[in-house]
Amino acid sequence: PGTEEFDLFVREVAREMTVKAGQKCTAIRRVIAPRSYNEALIESLGARLGKTTIGNPADEAVRMGPLASLDQREEVRARIRDLSADAEIVAGDPDNPSIQSGDASAGAFLNPVLLYCDRPGAARAVHDVEAFGPVSTVMPYDTAEEAVDLARRGKGSLVASVFTNDPGFAEEVVLGLAPFHGRVMIGNRTSAKSSTGHGSPLPGLVHGGPGRAGGGEELGGMRGVKHYMQRT
């Protein structure tokens, strides 16, 4: 708290939770932070999420629209209940969305929901359950080694981000995360000036796997050409 890295971290987590209403493969599901930051982080992140205007995306004042369908909203609510086996909700009411515009009864609106798990080393749901929506769980660590261990319990992901201005800490954590994540981003006061953020695809790198958009190479610059070529 009180550092540029802390502010960048809070802003990036809130953005990655709410862009596309959290319905994207690189959305932040687990927030691993120093235990001494618990109170300040939950307060700052909860306040930022609470200011998110929800409603009809055609409304210029709205910053987050609905989920893909009413069924998807019920699925996310069910996953929140699963997560609640290990964690408690500290911000956001999943059952009573606060919307700026649109029809609350017909639209699949959902408030951003932040949970807190005090003992993530002994928990399973917070590492195994993915709520494909604006939902994330804060979990504390006491050492860099513990932070890496908690990250690894997610069994791999497309991207992990480390926010720190300490080169030694960054080196230790990045080396521990690299085998389990497709990309590792380092965020600090210097890189923030040019960083495209946690979830942005980068030129020359594949982004994602085989899906409706392609094989992950369509955003890879010149590598994208190979997507349309026969190769043996």
What are these regions (language model features)?
Residues P1-G121, D149, L177, M222, ...:
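ALDH superfamily catalytic-core signature
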